[in-house]
């Protein structure tokens, strides 16, 4: 097994964690808002000081690669690449929507064998970034930017119980309005949940090119005009 530093900045939550042999040995989280530019460097420095003080060699850095916040992803990936350069370790990317599934599966809330998981990240209005998986994390439908109405997932809901979660899910459930639609609240993409996915990629040598890797934004960045002009 390996020692992996994990970085997650795809939403307003900033989190950093370290795993050794698959167990979390260090974690830091900030839920106060999009403070990645302020918090992330501090948390990463603390994590690296922790592994150094315990004489634990770092084997890789895992980073949530998107989709999600354009600015957050850019900050997280830049930090991860910097550590990889500085420490000469491997870079591992973990898809954000797949990461969201980990705490749901670990909680064992889903009992139906044919259940589907639908992690959602809020985009804007009734739009979400969403993907569908079965309970083994096999992809059933690829990532899409969905403008949600009552027909969006109907073909899946007519055949399966579907569990929706993530920061885009709650606003959609009333619109989806189907007896097979279930909401799981409080699920966030966190660095401490990245380890099972990162370890698997480490074992399979699924590494990214540190020089050329970029986040998966799904959609182009759209700049917002300020509400007030000075």
Predicted regions located by residue number:
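Stable alpha-helical structural segments in soluble proteins, enriched in small hydrophobic residues
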Residues: 47-51, 86, 104, 191-202
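Residues at secondary-structure transition points
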Residues: 31-39, 70, 74, 78, ...
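Acyltransferase
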Residues: 140, 184-230
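Surface "functional belts" at beta-alpha junctions
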Residues: 23, 35, 90-189, 217, ...
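DPxDG-like acidic metal-binding loop motif
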Residues: 62-96
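N-terminal beta-alpha supersecondary unit
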Residues: 1-65
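Phosphate-handling active-site elements
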Residues: 51-58, 85-94, 110-112
